Amino acid sequence: AVVPFGGGTSVVDGVDVTDRLTVGVAFWEMNSVLDLDTETGEVRVQPGIGGPELERWLEARGFTWGHIPQSWERATVGGYVATRSAGQTSTGFGRADATVTKLRIAAPVADFDLGRAPGTAAGPDLKQVFLGSEGSFGIITEIALRVRPLPEKKVYEGLLFPSFVAGKRAFRQLALDRVPADMMRLSDAEESAVNLAMSGLSGITKQAFDRYTALRKVAGGCLAIVGWEGPADVVAARRAHAYAVFRQFGAVRLPATVGRSWEKNRFAAPYLRDDLLDAGYLVETLETANEWSQLDATYDAVHDGLRGALGDPLVGTHLSHIYPTGASLYFTVITPLADDPVAQWKAAKAAAT
């Protein structure tokens, strides 16, 4: 087997050696920007370039790709594309694969040069065979991506909904209205408590926050982080519509520090995992997606499965990556380590699945 290796952030054991010869192909030297077409809004890159490196290069020229997943600090663009990575603004700008305009592939049967026009009606789109294939059918050697000018305005803000169901319904309404925020993330009560504890509120500010949320009947509620990017007047109009919807579902705006704290600390969680493991805790994640009508049942079923397998774990859940017909649910599980943590997690994952 030939296995492409980018930043090493995958969690699917793609480079584990099997009972046959396995060759890992690292892309550390294929990390260049090849071209930027400013009129078309398209950048051509090699697959080994990292997300931060590409973003810095584009920003210096007045552009942004804007794809920022949890693994942004270490993963490569080739990895994003090969796994159909979904970043924090996927609701507004699409997943990584939605921004791919051209691909060059080295495959066992032939080399492929895919994507020569903005759109085509000439049969199946062969790019879709390789996007999300995780290297199964060939190796991505070159990628062209749709980029956009740096936004005039960028806003990230926090809200508190009285319940997870209320927040979900508000997000669904924005999706149906076809004017969602570019970034939409809703945490359940368990995850919200952790996030708010890390938001920087303390002392008198924390006391005032607690009194305010109690008065507005959202104490212990569910934290939402929403964000918009673009021309200032467009952001203002979309934001006004969103808040009109949010108010219908009982949402209360939070201090600006909450949104700023999330933006500053959004990549901190994976680093806490090592400390928790050292302290004797298993920390793992699950992700799935479903239609709006099935999300509540999915949420309950996964929680029930995890509790049945692990006893009384801490399970924090957030809803993100909003689509017109549904959304993703992301579960973070923390529980004391068993003597055999691998078997412990396999049993929990099977129960949740």
Predicted regions and their residues:
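Glycine-rich N-terminal segment of FAD-binding domains in flavoprotein oxidoreductases
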Residues: 1-29, 65
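Core alpha/beta catalytic barrel or barrel-like domain that forms the active/cofactor pocket
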Residues: 5-9, 68-71, 75, 316-328
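Short glycine-enriched loops at secondary-structure junctions
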Residues: 7-8, 28-30, 137, 259, ...
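Beta-rich nucleic-acid/ligand-interaction surfaces
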Residues: 11-13, 74-78, 191-193
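Short low-complexity, flexible loop/linker segments enriched in glycine and/or proline
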Residues: 17-21, 80-83, 198-200
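Short beta-strand elements
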Residues: 23-25, 101-105, 128-132, 138-147, ...
